[in-house]
């Protein structure tokens, strides 16, 4: 599963769910458009276990409510 949010013409945030070595993960990472017109990941991002998602969403909902 994948979600993309364009930040500019050359940058976007990609949210992905994946499985690595038996662990269900969620990754949020900034991608940039290379000179070769290919979207590549940057070092800017975070990956966490899917079982931590409720905590992250709870905090984001608190921010949204402010």
What kind of feature is each model-predicted range?
Residues 1-8:
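Negatively charged, low-complexity tracts enriched in Asp/Glu with abundant Ser/Thr
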Residues 12-13, 24, 54, 61:
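Residue-level marker of intrinsically disordered, low-complexity segments enriched
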Residues 13-44:
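A short, structured beta-strand/loop element
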Residues 44-66:
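Mixed-charge, Lys/Arg-enriched low-complexity segments
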């Amino acid at each position: 599963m994948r979600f993309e949010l364009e930040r500019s013409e050359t940058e976007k945030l990609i949210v992905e769910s994946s499985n690595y070595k038996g662990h269900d993960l969620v990754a949020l990472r900034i991608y940039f458009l290379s000179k070769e017109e290919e979207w590549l990941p940057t070092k800017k991002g975070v990956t966490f276990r899917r079982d931590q998602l409720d905590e992250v969403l709870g905090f984001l909902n608190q921010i949204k409510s402010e």
